[in-house]
């Protein structure tokens, strides 16, 4: 086949364009987080200061969520994230993350989101709440929300692990985990996490739990092959 000079030039341009649009190599790091030892025995929360809450949970008492384990002692509510090694990050998502006060508790106990990303806070209960994120690095604030009022939004400027409480209902507790990185996950009942789309490089991966602190591990990615990384926290005596 004789393409001629013009044909060869067009073919070269096409090949270069194809190379330029190919996706860079990326891998996935996944694993599980377990608790070694016996989890503390949970005592139902005392809701007696709010009779409506007592009625809501008459059939099934509301339990604390600071230490929750699933089958096989898999640990829930652990934030696993890239804490070192990433040079570039994706833009902050334009959509807000949702945080609701419903049934006398926070529907998401540990909510992780990006620095600069809005968190939209709702009150779905038929009574007032006063949400109070106790920030130390970012600005601390608290806001009362009457029943039936619209949600409000807030964004944080700096990375921080922020305890959240309700000034009206002392048993309502949670965490805002504000991260610079876009590579993070929060474990569910199965204790598993997945961090996809990691280009080749050396990374520090951190696992954080509100009761058991932090652990870090180093991992090197050389191509697109998936890797497994597990964390084990030790129960307190």
Positions of PLM-derived features:
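Bacterial N-terminal signal peptides
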Residues: 7-18
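Positively charged n-region of N-terminal signal peptides that target proteins for export
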Residues: 1-6
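Extracytoplasmic copper-binding redox domains, predominantly the cupredoxin/blue-copper superfamily
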Residues: 20-237
């Amino acid at each position: 086949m004789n393409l001629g000079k013009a044909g060869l030039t067009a073919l070269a341009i096409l090949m270069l364009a194809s190379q330029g649009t190919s996706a860079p190599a990326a891998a996935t790091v996944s694993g599980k987080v377990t608790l070694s030892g016996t989890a503390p025995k949970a005592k139902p929360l005392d809701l007696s200061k709010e009779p409506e809450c007592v009625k809501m949970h008459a059939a099934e008492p509301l339990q604390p969520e600071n230490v929750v384990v699933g089958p096989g002692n898999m640990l829930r509510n652990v934030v696993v994230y890239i804490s070192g090694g990433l040079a570039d990050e994706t833009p902050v998502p334009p959509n807000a993350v949702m945080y609701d006060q419903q049934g006398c508790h926070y529907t998401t106990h540990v909510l992780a989101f990006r620095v600069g990303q809005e968190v939209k806070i709702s009150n779905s209960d038929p009574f007032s709440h006063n949400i109070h994120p106790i920030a130390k690095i970012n600005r601390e604030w608290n806001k009362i929300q009457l029943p039936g009022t619209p949600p409000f939004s807030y964004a944080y400027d700096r990375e921080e692990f922020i305890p959240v409480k309700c000034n009206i209902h002392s048993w309502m507790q949670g965490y805002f985990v504000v991260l610079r990185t876009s590579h993070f996950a929060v474990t569910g009942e199965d204790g598993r996490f997945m961090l996809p789309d990691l280009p080749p490089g050396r990374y520090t991966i951190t696992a954080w739990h509100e009761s058991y602190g932090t652990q870090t591990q180093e991992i090197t990615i050389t191509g697109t092959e998936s890797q497994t990384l597990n964390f084990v926290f030790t129960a307190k005596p």
